[in-house]
């Protein structure tokens, strides 16, 4: 495969400085079609093209010069998808391994910015109880290892802000964490306050909170386990979490 001069994968490795990666296994599979009638979305990045005379090896399709590796990121809030039509995934050394590693790194670098589910208002119970099929993510139950982020506007003069998280009866045998941070998204490594105890029900009390915008987060700690089965990876353990964990949030000021 030959590399485009602007290839972002070059930030991770130089690939021998010849702008090529040689001898990547190809099973006569796909390439990205950018010709007439193409449905490739605008903004798709082209990284590499095939340097391969398929006619010489009696292939059904000529792929020389076609796009072999590409990526797409819809916006700042979405992730990045990086694709290739060949198979570098089983290689354990050299430039082909670097190629696979660079694709993974570029995809991870393209993680979307966190989004806010909504504003928490004093004395209003926010019910996060809907299912994915309801197509209403602002009020959908949380999935395993997910964060849900909310904002909270604290006025001047508040002595205490109390944030209460509750599970839903009959569906509360899960572990949820509750986090708070002033001025920015709350994660485990950055939160000013957090309760990571077992169970769903939590309460955070912020003494003399600074006026302005706070970020409140809920994280589902319960997750599935995996094992190798007859047909590949299987989920075991807490598979019920895959249906989502419903909960409610309420804020009060004193």
Residue ranges of each PLM-predicted region?
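Extracellular ligand-binding/catalytic regions of CAZymes and related secreted enzymes
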Residues: 1-2, 57-146, 233-254
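Residue-level signature for short turns and capping positions that connect secondary-structure elements
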Residues: 88-89, 168, 183, 221
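C-terminal edge strands of extracellular/lumenal beta-sandwich accessory domains
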Residues: 116-134, 138-160, 179-198, 206-254
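Short amphipathic, basic-aromatic surface patches that mediate peripheral association
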Residues: 158-170
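Extended, low-complexity, turn-rich repeat/linker tracts enriched in Gly/Pro/Ser/Thr and Asp/Glu
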Residues: 92-93, 167-175, 224-226
């Amino acid at each position: 495969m030959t590399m485009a001069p602007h290839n972002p994968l070059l930030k991770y490795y130089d690939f021998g400085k010849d702008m090529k990666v040689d001898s990547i296994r190809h099973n006569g599979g796909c390439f990205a079609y950018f010709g007439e009638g193409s449905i490739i979305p605008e903004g798709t990045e082209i990284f590499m093209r095939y340097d391969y005379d398929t006619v010489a090896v009696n292939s059904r399709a000529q792929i020389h010069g076609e796009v072999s590796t590409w990526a797409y990121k819809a916006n700042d809030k979405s992730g990045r998808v990086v694709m290739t039509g060949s198979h570098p995934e089983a290689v354990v050394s050299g430039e082909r391994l670097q190629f696979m590693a660079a694709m993974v790194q570029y995809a991870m670098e393209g993680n979307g910015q966190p989004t806010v589910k909504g504003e928490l208002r004093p004395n209003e119970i926010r019910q996060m109880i809907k299912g994915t099929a309801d197509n209403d993510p602002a009020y959908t139950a949380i999935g395993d290892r997910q964060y849900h982020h909310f904002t909270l506007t604290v006025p001047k003069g508040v002595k205490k802000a109390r944030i209460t998280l509750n599970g839903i009866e009959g569906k509360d045998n899960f572990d949820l964490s509750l986090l708070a941070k002033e001025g920015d998204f709350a994660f485990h490594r950055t939160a000013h306050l957090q309760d990571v105890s077992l169970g769903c029900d939590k309460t955070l009390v912020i003494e003399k909170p600074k006026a302005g915008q706070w970020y409140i987060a809920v994280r589902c700690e319960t997750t599935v386990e995996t094992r190798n089965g007859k047909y590949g990876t299987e989920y075991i353990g807490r598979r019920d979490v895959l249906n989502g964990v419903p909960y409610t949030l309420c804020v009060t000021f004193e």
